[in-house]
Curated annotation (Swiss-Prot):
Protein name: Transmembrane protein 216
Its biological purpose: Part of the tectonic-like complex which is required for tissue-specific ciliogenesis and may regulate ciliary membrane composition.
Organism: Bos taurus
Transmembrane segments: 15-35, 49-69, 82-102, 115-135
Protein localization: Membrane; Cytoplasm, Cytoskeleton, Cilium basal body
UniProt key word Transmembrane helix: yes
UniProt record, GO biological process: cilium assembly; non-motile cilium assembly
UniProt gene name: TMEM216
Oligomeric and partner information: Part of the tectonic-like complex (also named B9 complex). Interacts with TMEM107.
Keywords, in A-Z order: Cell projection, Cilium biogenesis/degradation, Cytoplasm, Cytoskeleton, Membrane, Transmembrane, Transmembrane helix
Amino acid sequence: MAPRGKRLSSTPLEILFFLNGWYYATYFLLELFIFLYKGLLLPYPTANLVLDVVMLFLYLGVEVIRLFFGTKGNLCQRKMPLGISVALTFPSTMMASYYLLLQTYVLRLEAIMNSILLFFCGSELLLEVLTLTAFSSMDRM
């Protein structure tokens, strides 16, 4: 924890967490509607559709936990929650990559939405590492 009066929280990181929270909520709802569209109009195998929807709900859980711990760690200037958020960035990135590249059918809208999610993940990872470095350097003083 930082000394009294010394603030090490990253404002750009907090802005990214806030924007990503709203963006992910929109992404999740749009992705549900896209799966409904795919299930009704495309010859989408039922097993694949169920798997993709279940994975989307798992992705929701991972992303909500990641954003919660990232925000908590940044605002409270704690390394452990921010480290958990960094660790959860990798499964989150893998899920976004799966929905970008490995689904049965990938629509152009999904490609754009997942590219934006990957941009958020990459930017947040960079700022989280910089913030963790700042927190660690203050512990040594």
